């Protein structure tokens, strides 16, 4: 079940961290990291008002520093990024998971 979006006013920088719910390895090798970077670039193209200031990818989580221009953009961007990455991750591994990673 999706969580209620947080209010995140535009014009401010936000540190966002996302990890798997069960601590599973999210990024096993270079192609996994590169696949996430492609999804990240695609998401930024979909929400042109969101600026990526910095990012760090770890084996079981990632950190982003994002600067949304408008109110509500951060939630929309993170929802799309999380759901798209999870769907592609499950499809690549032929797992039956639905929703967030680690289910």
Please place each PLM-identified region on the residue numbering.
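Short catalytic/metal-binding and nucleic-acid-binding patches
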Residues: 1-103
């Amino acid at each position: 079940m999706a969580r209620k979006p947080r209010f995140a006013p535009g014009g401010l920088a936000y540190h966002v961290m996302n990890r798997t719910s069960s601590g599973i390895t999210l990024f096993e090798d270079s192609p996994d990291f590169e696949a996430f970077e492609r999804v990240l670039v695609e998401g930024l193209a979909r929400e042109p008002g969101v600026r990526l200031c910095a990012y760090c990818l770890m084996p079981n989580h990632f950190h982003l520093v994002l600067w949304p221009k408008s109110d509500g953009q951060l939630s929309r961007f993170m929802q799309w990024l999380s759901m798209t990455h999870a769907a592609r991750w499950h499809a690549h591994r032929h797992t039956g998971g639905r929703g967030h990673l680690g289910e």
